[in-house]
């Protein structure tokens, strides 16, 4: 029962539950309007989100939902941030030298969609939290679904009146001496990559890692190969200290980007990012960016591959993140000739479905054009008359590039 436990004890129990659930890292962030969220507003206003309109979702008052948790979860007092290591012992996909094969981002090699893997574990942490603070006889509804539906149950415990005291700079730190006698409502909501919040900001303030110049969260021991999951809660837990920035003067990630997607340290223009172009971008890819895409067909890890903090990154122990056969360096002709049925069967349960069949085929013919392998020309000439006009246009470009190289 929560009244018998100090806030710090509940916080420790949550972190222990996260470790038991399989998370390598867990921390607590307070709910505040951090400066980084103001930067997010400016990033959106500058058009750097590209066509990712879900980033621009607004509430009834016209405010960006992701810019402040107070907009979508006014009851939230703490954010539990959990992280899983997805790095494997396999070489980088771009180290595959066969020109007939493409490159896929490391996170998409897995045997199971990471959203499901992380959410399953978040639910275990959420359940442990409820078990610790629910009064006898008051059982909460089943754990949060992937859509992030909030679950609530009344309880007497941590937070109380203090959870409601919010000054201009956000919630006040929880006090171990505090004991609440008035009943409050425990509310939780789980999110994995799809919720209306900027998870990386809260990961920083939960001490998970610092925001690198490549905009990824970097942990001193694990590097940047991390999947993040968050649990919003109405309980005011003991927050961790934000992780210090350890990038120093290094600019390797910025210098290595083949499409110059970084407009400065910590500033990414999605419109030029290979991950965005191969996954989120619909329709045609600007010609001036195609050559820089190399043989990437889904995502890009270059800015992480070159990061010194990833040189000795630990390999994951989670079997779900081991590569599926053929996913590390898939044959380009196989991808380009894939039928709708093949696509559905091959990528069932994979994040690669996000690109859709047309996008993956488009990416494959661009990769053929960048392969330097003229054996692709006959196949590209065939695709130049494809019923998908986007694939056809990119195939013509690729065939011309190979013919004149």
What do these predicted regions represent?
Residues 1-8, 16, 62, 127, ...:
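Intrinsic disorder/low-complexity segments
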Residues 324-358, 365:
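Alpha-helical adaptor scaffolds
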Residues 357, 387-389:
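Short inter-helical turns and helix N-cap capping residues of alpha-solenoid HEAT/ARM repeat scaffolds
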């Amino acid at each position: 029962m929560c009244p018998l436990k100090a806030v710090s004890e509940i916080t420790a129990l949550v972190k222990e539950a996260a470790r038991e659930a399989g998370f390598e890292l867990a921390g607590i962030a307070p709910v505040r309007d951090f400066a980084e969220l103001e930067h997010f507003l400016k990033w959106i206003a500058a058009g750097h989100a590209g066509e990712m309109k879900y980033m621009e979702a607004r509430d009834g008052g016209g405010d960006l939902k992701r810019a402040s948790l107070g907009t979508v979860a006014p009851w939230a007092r703490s954010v539990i941030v959990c992280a899983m290591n997805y790095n494997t012992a396999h070489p980088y996909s771009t180290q595959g030298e066969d020109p007939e094969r493409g490159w896929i981002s490391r996170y998409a090699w897995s045997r199971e969609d990471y959203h499901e893997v992380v959410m399953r574990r978040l639910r275990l942490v959420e359940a442990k939290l409820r078990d610790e603070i629910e009064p006898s006889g008051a059982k909460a509804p089943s754990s949060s679904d992937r859509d992030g539906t909030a679950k609530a149950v009344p309880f007497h415990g941590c937070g109380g009146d203090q959870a409601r005291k919010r000054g201009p700079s956000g919630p006040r730190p929880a006090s171990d001496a505090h004991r609440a006698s008035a009943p409050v409502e425990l509310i939780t909501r789980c999110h994995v990559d799809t919720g209306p919040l900027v998870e990386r900001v809260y990961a920083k303030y939960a001490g998970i890692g610092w925001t690198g110049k490549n905009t990824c969260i970097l942990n001193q021991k694990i590097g940047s190969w991390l999947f993040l999951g968050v649990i919003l809660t109405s309980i005011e837990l003991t927050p961790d200290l934000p992780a210090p920035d350890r990038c120093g003067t290094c600019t390797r990630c910025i210098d290595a980007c083949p499409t110059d997607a970084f407009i400065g340290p910590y500033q990414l223009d999605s419109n030029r990012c290979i991950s965005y172009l191969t996954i989120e971008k619909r329709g045609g890819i600007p010609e001036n960016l195609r050559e820089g895409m190399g043989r990437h067909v889904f995502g890009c890890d270059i800015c992480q591959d070159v990061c010194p903090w990833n040189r000795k990154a630990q390999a994951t122990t989670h079997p779900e993140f081991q590569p599926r056969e053929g996913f590390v360096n898939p044959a380009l002709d196989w991808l380009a000739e894939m039928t709708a049925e093949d696509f559905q069967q091959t990528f069932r349960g994979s994040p690669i479905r996000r690109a859709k069949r047309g996008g993956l085929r488009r990416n494959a013919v661009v990769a053929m054009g960048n392969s330097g392998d003229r054996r692709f020309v006959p196949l590209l000439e065939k695709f130049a008359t494809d019923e998908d006009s986007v694939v056809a246009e990119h195939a013509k470009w690729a065939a011309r590039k190979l013919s004149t190289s």
